[in-house]
Curated annotation (Swiss-Prot):
One of its GO terms (cellular component) is cytoplasm. It is found in: Cytoplasm. Its main location: cytoplasm. This is Isocitrate dehydrogenase kinase/phosphatase. It comes from Yersinia enterocolitica serotype O:8 / biotype 1B (strain NCTC 13174 / 8081).
Length: 575
């Protein structure tokens, strides 16, 4: 029998989610103003604020429920009825899928991530799969060239909500039209239909027009990043029309977009067509619904495990001194557990490692740091764990294991996108691949540094290569802000004997870094040394790093491009 208390609990949770998502939309709606004001520090603050909203509102609801129930414990039947009532509130609810995740979060906070069974929380959704395949209201407007591509582009750009003047709109329209004609024939463009999202996608210092270019036999992305010039005028920086380029723009190593999406499921469905390689989890994360993205990641994991018979194995690559990393051979993610004891040379605590991972979650990842999802009390069937991995788990993380007989519980782990470790990639690379990898590695270091992130441990084993060939950092236990580091030149030796001594002839403080030393541990291979010296020798000079520090201290926020600089209209010759 359903009681008023059960109904009150269900309604309180849904009202709490309503409040959270209302604040989420409120912060998101401010993105246009922040962009128009070129208030880049406010952009960074809003990003962190929006990430914190979810956990904050979960905490508020948990306190409400403790007050309502007088902190009583309830039996299984009571909890099942609460979920049934909550499920009954969702069929006509516009954000049902995230409301389910919010319910899960409240349950987990109340019951310490214990007893996570489908009868008590939404392990899988209660609603029809992809309910918004037919979108209830238009998310985009349609445009057709009708023999005048430039005229159509002018209508599209003049229709944008931005209130700033264009630097040179006819020039940009010419650039876009030329770029389109370089990728598509006149016959294709003559019958093309363009769909442009009603809302702009804001991230970093850009506002992205996101659209689709529909041809008779295929749909392509149509992406235009809009930037400021120094005088406050707007300009289009490039035109991207390949699905590979779109995948990088919406990549897992980038900050979440701010896009006004009162119907997030509908937005995800609309994006799916131009991002076919992205999972549902990745699409939700891309639009800022990272907690529901975590739910979808777990569901994707459960589906994979159910459909395969693979065993969990130790992840390929050099074993970490702080993290134990394992995976499934065909799964596109890895699982990372903080070891109970670290290698002696690692002067870091477990608390500090947790702080580092949270820092990455909240910071601008500039396309160079992999996003992670954090789980507690992660259950794995023991027969799915290889003997080697089980031994490793029992040796390295016994304090984080709970043995249930046929299953084990890992009390805390991170799930992260799987990549090819850079050191393994380099070992197998041909000369061109090696050159590209070193160029990417150096660019990753420089872009992280410009965003006020110093990786700490810069060895190749701490970086991965994505399927698009991008180099991404993924080992965060020594990460810190650039402004916390003291970059020093190595003093000249006092005597010839100094260079032969086992100890340095100069004092070294905890935050001291000597970039000259990077050459010794990064360039042991002669080919690597050659490419490094050719493209990134500035990384070996303390003056380079101090210059970046000064720009950060001066309040400068660097541009972040989700495409190669040579693709910028200002960098390439439009023929």
């Amino acid at each position: 029998m359903v009681t008023k208390l059960e109904q009150l609990i269900a309604q309180t949770i849904l009202q709490g989610f309503d409040a959270q998502y209302g604040r989420f939309l409120e912060v998101t709606a401010g993105a246009q103003h922040r962009f128009e004001q070129a208030d880049w520090h406010a952009v960074q603050q809003a990003m962190k604020k929006r990430i914190h909203l979810y956990d904050s509102h979960v905490g508020l609801v948990v306190e409400q429920l403790k007050h309502i129930t007088d902190q009583r414990c309830f039996d299984v039947n009571f909890l099942t009825r609460v979920k049934e009532i909550y499920t009954g509130l969702l069929p006509d609810y516009p954000r049902f899928e995230i409301a389910e995740s919010f319910f899960n979060s409240v349950y987990c906070r109340l019951f310490k991530h214990r007893d996570l069974t489908p009868d008590k929380l939404f392990v899988f959704s209660s609603q029809p799969e992809r309910r918004f395949r037919e979108i209830p209201r238009p998310l985009a407007r349609d445009f057709a060239p009708k023999g005048d591509l430039s005229g159509m582009l002018q209508v599209v750009l003049n229709d944008l909500p931005l209130r700033l003047p264009w630097e040179n709109l006819p020039r940009d329209i010419g650039y876009i039209a030329t770029a389109l004609r370089q990728n598509f024939t006149d016959e294709q463009l003559a019958t093309a239909r363009f769909q442009v999202a009603n809302e702009l996608f804001y991230r970093n210092k850009a506002a992205w027009l996101v659209g689709k270019l529909r041809l008779a036999d295929e749909v392509y992305p149509f992406l235009l990043p809009i930037h400021h010039n120094e005088s406050g005028g707007l300009f289009i920086d490039t035109c991207l029309t390949s699905k590979a380029e779109a995948s990088i723009v919406f990549g897992f190593a980038r900050s979440y977009f701010m896009v006004y999406a009162p119907l997030p499921a509908a937005m995800v469905e609309w994006l799916r067509e131009i991002l076919p390689g992205k999972s549902t989890a990745e699409l939700y994360m891309a639009i800022g619904c990272q907690k529901h993205g975590k739910t979808e990641s777990y569901r994707e994991y459960l589906t994979f495990v159910h459909q395969s018979s693979e065993q969990f194995i130790i992840a390929p690559g050099v074993k970490g001194m702080v993290m134990l990393v394992f995976t499934l051979p065909s799964f596109d993610r890895v699982f990372k557990v903080i070891k109970d004891q670290f290698a002696p040379q690692k002067e870091v605590s477990q608390t500090r490692v947790l702080e580092c991972y949270q820092l990455v979650k909240e910071h601008d990842r500039v396309g160079r740091m992999a996003d992670t999802q954090e789980y507690e009390n992660f259950v794995i069937d023991k027969h799915r764990i290889s003997a080697e991995l089980l031994t490793e788990l029992q040796r390295e993380v016994p304090e984080k294991l709970e043995d249930l007989g046929d299953q084990i519980i890992i009390k805390h782990l991170y799930m992260e996108r799987r990549m090819t470790p850079l050191n393994l990639y380099i070992e197998q690379a041909n000369d061109q691949q090696l050159k590209d990898a070193i160029e990417e590695y150096g660019n990753a270091i420089k872009q992280l540094a410009a965003a006020n992130i110093f990786p700490g441990d810069m060895l190749f084993k701490n970086f991965g290569v994505t399927r698009h060939g991008r180099v991404v950092f993924y080992d965060y236990d020594e990460i810190c802000y650039m402004t916390e580091v003291n970059f020093r030149d190595i003093p000249p030796p006092r005597y010839p004997e100094d260079e032969m001594a086992s100890e340095p002839w100069y004092s070294v403080s905890p935050n001291d870094v000597f970039p000259e030393e990077f050459r010794h541990f990064l360039c042991t291979d002669l080919k690597v040394r050659h490419f490094f010296e050719e493209m990134h020798s500035d990384l070996f000079h303390a003056s380079y790093w101090r210059g970046l520090q000064q720009r950060i201290k001066d309040g400068h926020v660097e541009d972040v491009f989700a495409y190669r600089r040579k693709q910028r209209f200002s960098q390439r010759v439009i023929s």
